[in-house]
């Protein structure tokens, strides 16, 4: 296993990636030399430059001249010149999850995994620990206002991190608390079968290494329920389900805030108010509260922290709220996430919910096409674009028209539009939008830029054609 203390100069290939920049920031704050490269510049890379990182635009062999260890993610191909140079020089090469696993050894690790909600849940846990003055180290998969980024080096005993199950790397972490928000049939390109996915989560939950640690799980998930008999560690359950140890009940909206009551068995602990809508965020908040209670933080402190939690970037993030129109962006790219986000939007009582969706990966589109066809029930008007490949090669018969055709078959009365290129989408959305509408741009690719460009168009700033980032 990697020992951070054995290395002095880390080079990150793909430094601008959300998981990579979070780790780089931690190492810089720890006083470790960091360099890195990416294909294009960004605000994230500029921030790391300002903190002292040597940043290279473009991947070249000479970029790693001053490094004694290379860090890569699953997105880096074997033909990357920096990776090839590191191999030729016999430099140690580690996956980013190895760096995170090494950070977990600094203290009591709290790892959050699950098909959906792990970014928001881990961010909520971090905010609660901040308000409680626990000074945690935090590594997130999304950007938050309270961190002004997605990571921070703390001096307390807790390390809070999002654990990525997509490639199995979350099994490297030795934890104090392992949290699972849900288990679904995602990432089948890696696991092959749902059974293999569940086996991985069993191993993750059983990898709690502290005697006083435990497994905190959302029992609303059928996948979680299926593996409970195999969990050998202390289990604390939460959810809407009546059988949960900690329950969220009496969910309602007041002045666009989401309120719910929290019960521990039959004892009412109090009421929570969230700025972000939706039952999925209620579950995430409840999970964060349970983690905080387990670590000795009062319920009242959690309530205070969650009342000012503004969300995670690209998770129901407001882009514009003017001219009677509300433009929101959301990272949802799995059918369950899509359905939950649209349901939350519908419950907010706008005239129409318009959804512009960009499918993410050919493999996911193929494997979950039937689930996608059902996910858009709460959208009043739909726009679809071509598939965002995310580095995948095309699959014959799978393209951007697949999902809209299936949705049209299931919901023949819904207005459905196909706009192949994202850069053509803002003008089409501008024609469709009306006062009191909510528009949600949705997907894990570059669809968010369509909402930003539409906001500029509505504010009279015109359109930009920069859809590369």
Model region roles, listed by residue range:
Residues 3, 26-32, 49, 62-63, ...:
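Phosphate-binding loop of NTP-binding sites
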């Amino acid at each position: 296993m990697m020992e951070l203390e054995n290395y002095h100069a880390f080079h990150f290939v793909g430094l601008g990636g959300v998981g990579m920049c979070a780790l780089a920031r931690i190492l810089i704050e720890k006083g470790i030399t960091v360099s890195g490269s990416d294909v294009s510049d960004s605000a994230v890379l500029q921030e790391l430059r300002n903190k002292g990182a040597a940043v290279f635009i473009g991947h070249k062999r000479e970029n790693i001249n001053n490094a004694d260890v290379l860090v890569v993610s699953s997105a880096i191909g074997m033909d990357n010149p920096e990776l090839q140079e590191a191999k030729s020089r016999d430099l140690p090469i580690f996956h980013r999850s190895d760096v995170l696993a090494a950070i977990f050894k600094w203290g009591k690790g709290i790892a959050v995994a699950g098909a959906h909600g792990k970014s928001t849940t881990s961010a909520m846990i971090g905010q609660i620990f901040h308000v409680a003055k626990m000074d945690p180290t935090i590594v997130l998969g999304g950007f938050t206002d309270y961190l002004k980024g997605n990571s921070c080096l703390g001096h307390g005993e807790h390390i809070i991190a999002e654990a990525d199950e997509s490639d199995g790397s979350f099994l490297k972490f030795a934890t104090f608390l392992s949290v699972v928000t849900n288990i679904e049939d995602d990432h089948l390109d890696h696991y092959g079968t749902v059974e293999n996915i569940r086996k991985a989560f069993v191993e993750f939950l059983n990898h709690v290494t502290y005697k006083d640690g435990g497994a905190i799980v959302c029992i609303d998930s059928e996948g979680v329920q299926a593996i409970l008999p195999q969990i050998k560690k202390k289990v604390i359950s939460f959810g809407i389900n009546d059988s949960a140890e900690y329950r969220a009940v009496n969910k309602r909206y007041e002045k666009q805030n989401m309120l719910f009551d929290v019960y521990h068995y039959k004892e009412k602990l109090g009421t929570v108010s969230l700025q972000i809508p939706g039952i999925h965020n209620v579950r995430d908040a409840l999970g964060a509260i349970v983690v905080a209670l387990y670590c000795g933080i009062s319920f009242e402190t959690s309530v205070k922290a969650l009342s000012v939690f503004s969300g995670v970037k690209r998770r129901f993030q407001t882009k514009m709220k003017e001219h009677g129109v509300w433009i929101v962006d959301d990272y949802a790219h799995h059918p369950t996430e899509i359905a939950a986000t649209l349901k939350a939007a519908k419950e907010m009582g706008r005239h129409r919910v318009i959804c512009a969706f960009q499918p993410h990966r050919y493999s996911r589109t193929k494997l979950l096409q039937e689930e996608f066809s059902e996910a858009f029930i709460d959208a009043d008007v739909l726009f679809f674009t071509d598939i965002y490949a995310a580095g995948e090669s095309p699959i014959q018969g799978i393209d951007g028209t697949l999902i809209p055709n299936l949705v049209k078959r299931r919901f023949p009365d819904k207005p459905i539009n196909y706009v192949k290129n994202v850069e053509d989408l803002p003008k089409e959305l501008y024609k469709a939008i009306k006062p009191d509408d909510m528009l949600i741009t949705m997907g894990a690719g570059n669809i968010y830029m369509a909402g930003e460009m539409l906001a500029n168009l509505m504010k009279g700033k015109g359109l930009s054609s920069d859809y590369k980032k």
